[in-house]
UniProtKB/Swiss-Prot annotation:
Annotated region (Required for interaction with ubiquitinated UBE2D2), positions in chain: 150-306
Gene Ontology annotations for the cellular component aspect, listed alphabetically: cytosol; Golgi apparatus; nuclear speck; nucleus; plasma membrane
Subcellular location per the Swiss-Prot or TrEMBL entry: Nucleus
Species per Swiss-Prot/TrEMBL record: Rattus norvegicus
Annotated binding of Zn(2+) 4, by residue: 159, 162, 185, 188
InterPro entries from the UniProt entry: EPHD (IPR034732), PHD-type_Zinc_Finger (IPR051188), PHF7/G2E3_ePHD (IPR042013), PHF7/G2E3_PHD (IPR042012), Znf_FYVE_PHD (IPR011011), Znf_PHD (IPR001965), Znf_RING (IPR001841), Znf_RING/FYVE/PHD (IPR013083)
Residues flagged as site, Cleavage: 149-150
UniProt-listed SMART domains: PHD
Pathway this chain belongs to: Protein modification; protein ubiquitination
Residue ranges, compositional bias (Basic residues): 10-23
Binding site for Zn(2+) 2: 98, 101, 120, 123
Protein's recorded name: E3 ubiquitin-protein ligase PHF7
UniProt-listed Enzyme Commission number(s): 2.3.2.27
Amino acid sequence: MRTIKEKKEHPRLRKTARTKKVTHRKLSSGPVCLLCFQEPGDPEKLGEFLQKDNLCVHYFCLILSSKLPQKGQPNRGLHGFMPEDIKKEAARASRKVCFVCKRKGAAIRCQKDQCVQNFHLPCGQERGCLSQFFGEYKSYCGKHRPTQNIHQRSFGESCVLCCEDLSRASVENIRSPCCSQAIYHRKCIQKYAHTSAKHFFKCPQCNNREEFPQEMLRMGIHIPDRDAAWELEPGAFSELYQRYQHCDAPICLYEQGRDSFEDEGRWRLILCATCGSHGTHRDCSSLRPNSKKWECNECLPASTEDSVSENLGDTPCCSSTFCPHEPFLRATSLEENPGSSWTNWLQPSLLEKPESSSGSSCQSWRSKGIKVTKDCKKSK
């Protein structure tokens, strides 16, 4: 009898051990998210890892949780999510099983009607689920997610951003709405959106700022509402506040060297008035004691050409051929042209019938400064 009981107990032990293996989570040495039980991970996929009062959670897990309200102001709690509400949501999610990993704690549910799929955010991303970061922040399983019409022949092409081959899985590729031939990797577009942010995010090919961001939001791309990443780097524009401090004259006469100067006087450093990236001491370029304007050799030819073109206006280069001593006047309307042209001097009757012209025409010709021929005198 003892052997029969032992045989009956062994399967039970094996069964309980198997169930413990499924429900038991891998222990982590560091903090984990309360809503997905994952470590900080990639901020482009899971968002910023927030910690406050022994409460750790991913930013994307907060805003995508199905039943978590945002009751506070943005400066309270974790971006407006109160700690007590987060704990209540974690307690509710502890009764929901993820359809991917078969573990409890799934706080995100598919928003399609009559769909009961629940999942953790990292698990859903691996299985093709999609989350939208606008409006009601809806999430969908792989069966009900928004899709695009990407032709099968496009899979042999390359991504416009990374120039590598496109993935065979259509959920990992995104087609541009404004440039229909352009297809990107989802991870490339997400990295581009995370770097450029809302104010600089546009189509990489045609610079579309309206249709392109809207389609990317629909397809689950997170576009942060902040300045671009290159503007948030500490000291990114520090060189713009540095003044040029070097004498670039062919021969520097200052005893202390080219990198030294005085605030006033002969050895004051004068910067180029056009570019500001070259300088000289007053005495090194033979400037007047009170002069404050100087131009380097690189900017001087350009400024000289600009001044010449402004003085000449619309004067053509061949004006000296017509009149070497007087400025050339274009044949425009009478209001613009103060002088009379040759066609205005000749009357229509004289041009058509010269023999019928009277002596008054010769008088008018003399008044215009034109010599009268002998034929005209005879007719007079």
